[in-house]
Amino acid sequence: MAKQWEVVIGLETHAQLSTQSKIFSGTATQFGAAPNTQASPVDLALPGTLPVMNRGAVERAIQFGLAIGATVAPRSIFARKNYFYPDLPKGYQISQYEIPVVQGGQVTIQVPANEKAGKEAYEKVVNLTRAHLEEDAGKSLHEDFAGMTGIDLNRAGTPLLEIVTEPEMRSAAEAVAYAKTLHTLVTWLGICDGNMQEGSFRCDANVSVRPVGQAEFGTRAEIKNLNSFRFLEEAIQYEVRRQIELIEDGGTVVQETRLYDPDKRETRSMRSKEDAHDYRYFPDPDLMPLVIDAAWIERVKAEMTELPVAIQQRFVSQYGLTPYDANVLTSSKAMAAYYEAVVSKVGPANAKVAANWLMGEVSSQLNREGLDIAENPVSSAQLALLLQRIADGTISNKIAKEIFLAIWEEKATDESAADRIIEAKGLKQISDTGALEAIIDEVLAANPKSVEEFRAGKEKAFNALIGQAMKATKGKANPAQVNELLKKKLS
């Protein structure tokens, strides 16, 4: 019998904090500036310069700690992480090691169903080890210099919050669900813009495998700088296969840092993985301990908005949504606000229908055109009226989709756009029993073979007759009434 393997994953996520200036200097942090135009003497580590802590970076770390139910350390220490790299001008990185600013905490994730693997959607709590403040390094530029490497120090000193999980995730799907939930949280709080293409939110995945039932962890490999959810999933899936095949072929997994090549969809070795002692951490003598008192924490807490998890719980309890649906609808503040605006008009009784429309037709159209919910040309009031017309029987769901696209394409600004289009195009649903009976009689007369097959026990024939009735009315017949009248006439 083949050995069964368990996957063990921990993530380290670097969230660039959305401050106007760097963590230890007053230099701007704007992305895309010309190389080395946003690098001050402090960032360049020129002699005689001293770092000064950015209060805004600390407050963003406090917000995050409060949001995940962590302990915000009353006293934390900055340390020097010593290593050589051309884009690290000081020869060390200012980080936190022994006492981080945020300790513990947890994030609840919703893992989607996987029909191919026969797995249902489920909820899981991922515990965090810590989150600490540190400065980013510069950037090495290889493309524009033949045989040479250019150094851009604009990014050096940009504030980061490194968020570290316990090694508790057991699949690539769980890791992606966690990363997406974390991304939603930091953007919701406004502490990070979450732009993965610009490197504002990037993940390192620590991956190992072990035989099922074994308590001891296997040797891990760290995959660096994964800046998309797809790359994160593909990199973990490849690395798991690589390690299992290596072990089963008699080899040994080496502790190392690896990079993911998205073109080849594989990881490759970058360097041997360092341990903490290799960095020779010691307290930074230029920075006093960071002291955060209870009053400061309370001030930050008072300014925070309702968190996604609280809104999710409210959506489940008030509107009867599933935890997964509630999670999708709180993927951004704009999405949650749009949904609540629709529900406020259609009422809690139609909250599930509103959720289905937002996650289905609306999201599909947004994805097709590469738009965010905030750029949706169909307002919440317009969608609400459309859903009300489905609820009161004026139109069918199928016709509603046509009207939605019409509102979208004409970029209508009037709240009553749905009613206007229904009237102009004559799209009102046919609910008159007499009219429907006449149409159904014609359909039955024109399709004797389907009638015979249905009476012989073939259910598909009944669906075919419904389809013919809907076709005869150009989709305007009330489907429920058609179903009922057909059954009555065929009984």
From Swiss-Prot:
Keywords: ATP-binding, Ligase, Nucleotide-binding, Protein biosynthesis
Superkingdom assignment: Bacteria
Example of a GO biological process term: translation
The UniProt record lists the keyword Cell wall biogenesis/degradation: no
Enzyme class, UniProt record, top EC level: ligase
Molecular-function GO terms, alphabetical: asparaginyl-tRNA synthase (glutamine-hydrolyzing) activity; ATP binding; glutaminyl-tRNA synthase (glutamine-hydrolyzing) activity
Catalytic reaction equation(s): L-glutamyl-tRNA(Gln) + L-glutamine + ATP + H2O = L-glutaminyl-tRNA(Gln) + L-glutamate + ADP + phosphate + H(+); L-aspartyl-tRNA(Asn) + L-glutamine + ATP + H2O = L-asparaginyl-tRNA(Asn) + L-glutamate + ADP + phosphate + 2 H(+)
A Pfam family: GatB_Yqey
Record family assignment: Belongs to the GatB/GatE family. GatB subfamily.
Job of this protein: Allows the formation of correctly charged Asn-tRNA(Asn) or Gln-tRNA(Gln) through the transamidation of misacylated Asp-tRNA(Asn) or Glu-tRNA(Gln) in organisms which lack either or both of asparaginyl-tRNA or glutaminyl-tRNA synthetases. The reaction takes place in the presence of glutamine and ATP through an activated phospho-Asp-tRNA(Asn) or phospho-Glu-tRNA(Gln).
NCBIfam families from the UniProt entry: gatB, PRK05477.1-2, PRK05477.1-4, PRK05477.1-5
Record-given protein name: Aspartyl/glutamyl-tRNA(Asn/Gln) amidotransferase subunit B
Organism field: Paraburkholderia phytofirmans (strain DSM 17436 / LMG 22146 / PsJN)
